[in-house]
Structures are given as structure tokens and as C-alpha cells.
Amino acid sequence: GYAPLKKAIAEYEGVASESVICGNGAAELVFSLCQAVKPKKALIPVPTFAEYEQALTSCGCEVEHVLLREEEGFSLQDSFINWLHRDLDMVFLCNPNNPTGISIDREFLFRVLRVCREMDILLVVDECFLDFMEEPGRYTLKAQLSRYHNLFLLKAFTKRYAMAGIRLGYGITENTELLDAMTQVTQPWNISVMAQAAGIAALKETAYVEEGRQMVFREAKYLKEELQRLGMEVFPSEANYIFFHGPENLFEICVEQGVLIRDCSNYSGLRKGYYRVAVRTHEENQKLIRAMRDGTTKAAVAHAEVLKEEEQA
């Protein structure tokens, strides 16, 4: 189904519409992929998007983790290749990664892709945040689809077009057997008429996307500099969010100031003190920095008063 939408996506991506599958958000496609493949064993680096593991365990799959280390900047290392073995059915990679925003070098992805093909492993690469990178064309694996039938790319409208809640994502692969199997396990009419219309209209908005990208580049630079000035340890995110390490009570401090930030301590492989903030308008970003500055100052003053009282007691 959804022929006009699939045709519009195919034209936008420069692929055949037979290679496109649409989903109720990229998350639905992750689940239908797992239901279709029924993997026994899968590999994911952590921290990463939690839905991969959720989808894998929902179909009884055993999940192996490769820990991305703080001292290595949470980037995927060459040693990841050594974790690939013939018992694996699937590997999930997110580029750039969520929540860290750290990208994976394309040459390295080629190596992973080749080894996966040799070992008959399906490689799923989530490119939902790729459009926020300065040169997305240098990172996408789209050109490899025709040669590698073990490759599945995930994309979403949510991030690129600020369409959260409309629920529209898509996948691209030249593995027709896989697409047929996914269609079998996907409920019919999974995409509303409104989501289809919004998707077709959004794909024509090239100027809006470029404008949004430029704003993200500009504001991400501002946020990174300001967060560093506040003493936070900022990681080199290439997405439309910033990942950093700060005081363990920063979430509560911000809430008191009327600002919500994402506490990342519930991500597998992360401890307390890691946060992710979205890159928003300049005014909102200023408000965030102000809330952090005022909040941490207040907290420091209160802490000093407690120490003073303890000394006097």
C-alpha cells in the first residue's frame, strides 16, 4: 500500500519504490524487522536507542552488548569487528548515535558491512539523525544497498521535519524477501491518511530542511560553548542534540528552574550525571543555559550554607 508516499520517498532518496517500506514511525519498523527475521542472537553497542533491545527481546532474541567507553569518547572502536561472529543474526548501529550524537566513520561501516555479509548477518543502520550532520552524504550507506542485500537503512520524518506525533518512518533495503516478511507481520493500514499526506508534502520542503540544518549547526556551537563554560564535559555530538556530563543533581536543578533536560542514566552503559539536551531556538537555548547557571549557583550557595552550619554545629 501507500503507493504515492512510497513513490515520493523513492524519488527523494534516489531508490526504487520497491525498496521502500513505510512504518508508523521508525520504531514500528524496528519491531516488524525483529518479528520478520526472528533473530536468535543480535549485537548492539551501548549506550544506544533502547527500542532496538526492546524489539529484539520481544521476539525471544538473546542480545549481546559492546560497551562504548567514556575514555574512548563513546565512539565505536576497530575492536567492534572482533565482536562479530557467525552465530549472530542481526547487528544494530545508530549513525549518529542516540543519545551521544557520535558518528561512525563510513570506511569503518563498510568494513562492518563486508564482515556481516561474509557471516550472513543482517546489518541495520539507523540514519534517523543523519540529516543533522554537516555532510550526510559522506556518512550514509545508501549507495551500498544494491551490492549488499544484508543491509537495511532506517529513516524517520520526525527529526528532519519536526513531525513528532504524526508517526512516520521508512526503511530502505534491496532485500525483497525481507520486505515481504516484514509486510506479513505489519498490521494493515498502519499509516494514517494524514501521516501519508504530511509525508508527501514534507518531502517537497527542501528549503525548510536546509534552513533547519543551518540553525542547528549555529545553535549547537553556541550550546556546546556555553555548556563548557559552565564546567560541563561536552561530547562532540553531530546530531540535533548535545550529550554531556555534569553534576548528578542537574536534572533536579533544571526542573526547579522550570526546564526539562533528558537524564540519560537509564540508558544501558551510562551512569548518573549524563544528559542530553535538544538544540532549539536561540531564545530557548539561552533560557536553558540561564536555568543551569542560576540553578547551579543557587545549589552551590545552599551547599556552602549547609557546610557552614555543619562546621558551626
Predicted regions and their residues:
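PLP-dependent enzyme catalytic core of the Aspartate aminotransferase-like
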Residues: 107, 256, 266-313
